[in-house]
Amino acid sequence: MGKKDASSVKLPVDQYRKQIGKQDYKKTKPVLRATRLKAEAKRSAPGIRDIILVIVAVLLFLLGVYAFFYLNLSTELDLDVDMD
């Protein structure tokens, strides 16, 4: 008999979940589809942080190439001046 009485009392968490489930059923298919697509786009979109890191890496590479050529050309020019 104790089991019968215990099953009639529901936890507040279970009642809350049941209410949320009812609210979810009230949504129409286009709303649910839009919500799902928005969540997928948020998960799969590249972050601004990733884009900034790529741009910084490219700029550092270009700076390194520029510095390499600048140093090589400046030493060649110095040698030409010394030979005169």
Swiss-Prot record:
> What residues form the membrane-spanning segments?
51-71
InterPro entries per UniProt: TRIQK (IPR024842)
UniProt keyword list: Endoplasmic reticulum, Membrane, Transmembrane, Transmembrane helix
At the top level of its lineage, which domain of life is listed?
A: Eukaryota
User: Subcellular location, in the record's words?
Assistant: Endoplasmic reticulum membrane
Q: Write down any Gene Ontology CC term.
A: endoplasmic reticulum membrane
Q: How does it sit in the membrane?
A: Single-pass membrane protein
PANTHER family named among the record's database cross-references? TRIPLE QXXK/R MOTIF-CONTAINING PROTEIN, TRIPLE QXXK_R MOTIF-CONTAINING PROTEIN
Q: What does this protein do?
A: May play a role in cell growth and maintenance of cell morphology.
- Similarity remark: Belongs to the TRIQK family.
Name by which UniProt lists this protein: Triple QxxK/R motif-containing protein
